[in-house]
Amino acid sequence: MTSRPETKIPDEITSPYPIIGAGTIESGFGRGSAELGIPTANIPVTSELNKLETGIYYGWCRLVPRNQECAAKQRSDGKKVYFNNGTKLADDELETFPMAMSIGWNPFYNNETKTAEVHIIHKFRENFYGADLRYAVMGHIRPELNYTTKEALIADINKDIEITKDALSKPSYEKYRTKI
């Protein structure tokens, strides 16, 4: 594993941030929750996200339910996933929350496609596959790394989450909470 570089969060937001966007939540591989205990919401890699270096980013996000028929869909591993389009989200789950976003290939899992995986720093009661996720990427934490153990990967993700919370507590970042 390449060693984790030190993360320095600037007091003020610097270009190219913020990057404001949205995407509809897709089913992923089911690893975030099941294997790592850190659920993620997968969204399409937009042209704006694709311009960023692979790595881990911090920012704000919020879920927006979609008025669409609910349906079960089959994931790439054969498991059926229920898309409720966010219609089961409670009012307190529609607020803006901090997020840590991974953009890249997930070398630990040898992914063949580039993904954008968002860990929303909030405990949700229901899944929300099919909902829209609006986001503001506020900055970069670190490059994408490979790991020799799942435990090392989990430890680094948890560190990313703490860095995200600390960064977004700065006044210059906090003001963007209401802009998405």
Curated annotation (Swiss-Prot):
Belongs to the flavokinase family. Zinc or magnesium. Pathway: Cofactor biosynthesis; FMN biosynthesis; FMN from riboflavin (ATP route): step 1/1. Mg(2+) binds at T40, N42. This is Riboflavin kinase. It is an enzyme of class 2 (transferase). One of its GO terms (cellular component) is mitochondrion. It catalyses: riboflavin + ATP = FMN + ADP + H(+). Keywords: ATP-binding, Flavoprotein, FMN, Kinase, Magnesium, Metal-binding, Nucleotide-binding, Transferase, Zinc. GO terms for molecular function: ATP binding; metal ion binding; riboflavin kinase activity. Its EC number is 2.7.1.26. Catalyzes the phosphorylation of riboflavin (vitamin B2) to form flavin mononucleotide (FMN) coenzyme. One of its GO terms (biological process) is FMN biosynthetic process. SMART domains: Flavokinase.
